[in-house]
Amino acid sequence: MEVDLLHFEKKYHNCIVAGIDEAGRGPLAGPVVASAVIVDNANIITGIKDSKKLSKKKRELLYEQITSNYAWATAIISHTEIDDINILEATKKACSIAVANLSLEPEIVLVDGNMQFKDERFVSIINGDNLSLSIAAASIIAKVTRDRLMLDLSAEFPQYLWHKNSGYGTKEHIEAINIHGLSPYHRRSFRCC
């Protein structure tokens, strides 16, 4: 059965609706990135779905289309701030900043997952990146943005293979940590080895 990815956007059809998602909650290194997207219901880009279900090439293509056609914003919270305030609070902060940075003020903000926000505009949707087009679009922007950041950091610290693992705790990444120790970009609050 085909899921109507505009179901939630249609539910709030008289409102400006933003979708928000993050990338980088689980990695051992690098920032967490949140992106907010307001989809233009009169200009639907085909192929948008949860970033994890797309090839890198398709994500990059959709990134260009989304950023060229929709209102969007991104927020990045550093690994040091993640260590200072914890990953959940860092993610919430990134989400709030991304929404605040949009060129249009949304009346409803659809959020992937079950995070709770004090802002009453935020509506949490479990599995939202598979159920809402605007959340799926935000997942693509967040993932591509973070992957590009980790690619840049990988040039500085190639031994951790961030160009391949994006900072996640793969076997090779953990082996590199055991050999080389932690880089300045590793999250100290994450127990990895």
UniProtKB/Swiss-Prot annotation:
Cysteine disulfide links: none
GO MF: manganese ion binding; RNA binding; RNA-DNA hybrid ribonuclease activity
Keywords: Cytoplasm, Endonuclease, Hydrolase, Manganese, Metal-binding, Nuclease
Keyword Nucleus: no
Positions in coiled-coil regions: none
Catalysed reactions, as listed in the record: Endonucleolytic cleavage to 5'-phosphomonoester
Cofactors demanded by this protein: Mn(2+); Mg(2+)
Magnesium as UniProt keyword: no
E.C. code: 3.1.26.4
Cellular localisation: Cytoplasm
Cofactor note text: Manganese or magnesium. Binds 1 divalent metal ion per monomer in the absence of substrate. May bind a second metal ion after substrate binding.
Residues that, per the record, bind a divalent metal cation: D21, E22, D112
Cellular compartments per GO CC: cytoplasm; ribonuclease H2 complex
Domain of life of the source: Bacteria
Residue ranges constituting the RNase H type-2 domain according to the UniProt record: 15-193
InterPro entries named in the record: RNase_HII, RNase_HII/HIII, RNase_HII/HIII_dom, RNaseH-like_sf, RNaseH_sf
Single biological process term from Gene Ontology: DNA replication, removal of RNA primer
Family according to the record: Belongs to the RNase HII family.
Job of this protein: Endonuclease that specifically degrades the RNA of RNA-DNA hybrids.
Protein name (Swiss-Prot/TrEMBL): Ribonuclease HII
Protein's organism: Rickettsia rickettsii (strain Sheila Smith)
